[in-house]
Amino acid sequence: MGTWAARTQAAALHATLPRMDDNRPGAQGPQADPAAPDPAPDLALEAFTALCQRLAGFDDRLHPEWVDGYLTATAASWRTITLDELLEPMTGDAYSRTFADPADDAQARAVLEARMAALRQALDPESLLDDLDALRLQPWMAVWDDAARRELVEAGHVTEQEAATFHTGQEWAAGFLQATVDFAADWPDPPEARSGDPEGGLYADLLGTVAALAWDPASEEFRAFALAGWKNADPTRDEVIDEACFAVQELRLWWIDHPPKRPPRRVEAAPGRNDPCWCGSGRKFKKCHGVAA
């Protein structure tokens, strides 16, 4: 079994729905919000998990963790990215092959829309501003610990060396970063970053905090990241994940203060009243399409 397929299979065995433990400091589960639109968040996440596992039958990259990271990036953008916009870049032809039946397609879309709505609610700017210290984002992540890795190795799915590369949140971050590539126009380098403005540095740091989840904890780049954030101690995996989730929340707020500039709309100059009408009638504009003007 390939590494991607092994990740997909193992994710179903070692996932938490959601990963965030509601009694940890700062964590806020779906049931803590009385305005939550979904009365059964666990069932909604189970449906999302089952949907992604079907997608993974055609593209083993599309396991729930990766897809959830991808959807999270679209929810954290400065504008609303619709399901119709993101399906093809996210899934290629896997979605159309998996859900070819119209009824199946409608049900799958409802499941994805529900997950997207939950992510948008978690990243609602007003709610974030109400309590900047609250960890609202609840990512779908497979928990990789020594027992989970050992189980994969003993089942013969991967080697010990391959299992050692599996880390909680890694594929979620990979999905998030892929969405920023696929929707590069919605994740542009801000002018502040190009000009050396400190605000641009903050944007880069926030994205870097998410990217750090995808790095090998033994790598030099991760060690440099950990040293910058945790001066005298090695961070736990939970601490790194929490920082990434807070970074996503801050990115959502960053876009509120720094929306990309839209290109100016070009308005064609109207012909003069005595000019020939643009419709080709041969009459003057004032006696043709310019009458109303």
Give the location of each predicted region.
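Acidic/negatively charged segments and metal-coordination signatures
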Residues: 2-293
